[in-house]
Amino acid sequence: MSKKTVLVIADLGGCPPHMFYESVAASYHIVSYIPRPFAITKGHAELIEKYSIAVIKDRDYFETHPSFEHPDSIYWAHDDYPKSEEEVVEDFIRVASFFKADAITTNNELFIAPMAKAAERLGLRGAGVKAAEMARDKSQMRAAFNASGVKAVKTQPVTTLSDFQKAIESIGTPLILKPTYLASSIGVTLFHDKAGSDDLFLQVQSYLETIPVPDAVTYEAPFVAETYLEGAYEDWYEDEGYADYVSVEGLVVEGEYLPFVIHDKTPQIGFTETAHITPTILDNEAKQIIIEAARKANEGLGLEHCATHTEIKLMKNRETGLIESAARFAGWNMIPNIKKVFGVDMAKLLIDVLVDGKKAVLPKQLLSGHTFYVADCHLYPQHFKESGLIPPEATHITIDHVSIPEETFVGDTAIVSQSFPTKGTIVDLALFEAFNGIVSLELKGSSSQDVAASIRNIQKQATIQLMDELVKG
């Protein structure tokens, strides 16, 4: 049987390219369309070229950037993409039609809604237009969550300072303010009380104006204000080292939610994630409570065919609160780590679903039978500030090297892969914390508790040597 063709809208985020392209290309022909060439690293571009039967880049971009080169690394694409949503939809349709694509997918949060519109017009399976819009706009998402049968929270859209003042008066504190259109918890801010809240709101508003998004990204209001969900990890875990939230990775097939794996987390820096552990060590009762909440969240959004990444707050008395859900794969290495631990390739399974619907062969319950745990772990400037190695007044640092003592590892926990900064790496400490990952590690061990303890030790004991003459404050 000849391979079918899938159009991949290539951009940042979701399942990392080092797994995604190889997994999909083993069973399908890949046509890669790159709407934002500046959002593709050199390594990503090489994988696209290696595994795609055709690669198309947005020609309009090259009219103003004829000598463009892909960057070595990137976290957020800091360039303009002025096309309207309708223009983006038409581009997707044009490429898909030319190559007679049997499915269309993306790992990027910002193109979820236009892709859903393109899929619908092409008669292909997708998340569904209205569902995709709700999964993208966090204000609409919260309204759907509140109607889904899980814990409802007070919520209010916010555009102006006046809107914010009304929201904090109505909702009270603690209050969480979220940009409705971004990802990676960028700009998410907790307000503990009203004192100084106006200035903080204006500061966040001003900061977000420096973070570009495609003009195709639409929303009803740029922020949503919500009651903050208070976590209580001690009501869920017997051991320390875990956070008060989890994520569930799954698929939706013909409107039915299928959970695959629950990921444990380690405590955040503000709202910046620090580590994900595959899979959870929670007991069966806890797992069932979480799965039911995730099911209500995703089916409540009305999603049809897509991957899902659902974040759930673990609250007192084992009550759950919905943080958010995305109609795409999780980022970091969560999807590759599922394959390492369970041998299940979610990237391929998503395309199976988009091509064959319920005919695709899928697991019917949470994956089980693992013999080890894998963790994604990042170190940020805040970790080194807390250990006194980065001066509190510093605004920029230049790194000489970073070291991790061997004695930080507990049990049989070991580093599988690692990425350290090269000498001379400059870090702008004014940037959002998530933009400033300094070290990334993949850890493996037979005990989740030992892995979590190792992460805690690394965060406290890792050392950073700065080039003192280049520290600016």
Report the location of each language-model feature.
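ATP-binding N-terminal substructure of ATP-dependent carboxylate-amine bond-forming enzymes
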Residues: 1-131, 135, 140, 162, ...
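Active-site "cap" helix and flanking loop/linker of ATP-utilizing ligase/carboxylase catalytic domains
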Residues: 2, 289-310, 316, 326-393
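Conserved ATP-binding module of the ATP-grasp superfamily
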Residues: 152-153, 174-177, 194-239, 273-274, ...
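Conserved protein kinase catalytic/activation segment
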Residues: 318-321
